[in-house]
């Protein structure tokens, strides 16, 4: 697993995000992280092509077969722009003569209390059509990885509580014919 973070700071956070990223990635077994310096709270003002080029550089380096990004209709502006830029960067093998093979799958992920908060339109809804079976251990690792970030995990009924995250995995699993699953 490789992770490309376009922004690693936010003026609204007071925790040590770099430590959280390192701890979270260690829990998940991330091989390499690509960390950009684009401003989280001013993403719409960033150079769009610079963001695409940063993602393309990560694609050239790790050569993924699967790219997972935010859903385009995510309520957070930076998540929507990230999704758009990832789609553009994924076309790299078609635009340039390079040694990068095609990306076989692009999956939009579900982010609790983010993907589901946007206006409900026929175009903007998260409607999963791909599921990845996960284990109870995977769910525990996900929860542990998220827990290293201050104020991300909340008490139920918040969408990012351990109870709700587990319930979502059970619900998505039932849709996929498995005990637990993640939806894309």
Per-region residue spans from a language model:
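Alpha-helical scaffolding within the catalytic cores
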Residues: 18-22
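Metal-dependent de-N-acetylase/amidase catalytic core
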Residues: 11, 15-16, 26, 45-184
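A structural preference for short, hydrophobic beta-strand core positions in alpha/beta folds
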Residues: 3, 34-37, 108
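A conserved beta-strand->alpha-helix junction
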Residues: 27-40
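ATP-dependent adenylation/pyrophosphate-handling site
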Residues: 1-15
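A short, flexible beta-alpha/helix-coil linker loop
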Residues: 8-9, 39-41
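Residue-level marker of intrinsically disordered, low-complexity segments enriched
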Residues: 3, 25-28
């Amino acid at each position: 697993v490789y992770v490309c973070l376009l922004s690693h700071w936010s003026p609204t956070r007071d925790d040590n995000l770099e430590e959280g990223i390192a701890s979270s990635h260690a829990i998940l077994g991330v091989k390499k992280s690509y960390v950009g310096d684009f401003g989280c709270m001013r993403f719409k003002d960033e150079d769009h092509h610079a963001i695409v080029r940063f993602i393309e550089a990560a694609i050239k380096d790790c050569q993924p077969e699967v790219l997972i990004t935010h859903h385009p209709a995510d309520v957070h502006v930076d998540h929507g722009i990230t999704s758009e830029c990832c789609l553009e960067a994924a076309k790299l093998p078609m635009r340039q003569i390079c040694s990068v093979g095609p990306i076989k799958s692009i999956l939009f992920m579900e982010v609790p209390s983010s993907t589901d908060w946007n206006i409900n339109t026929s175009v903007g809804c998260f409607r999963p059509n791909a599921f990845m079976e996960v284990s109870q251990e995977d769910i525990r690792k996900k929860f542990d990885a998220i827990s290293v970030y201050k104020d991300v995990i909340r008490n139920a009924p918040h969408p990012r509580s351990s109870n709700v995250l587990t319930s979502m995995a059970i619900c998505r699993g039932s849709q996929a014919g498995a005990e637990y699953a993640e939806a894309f």
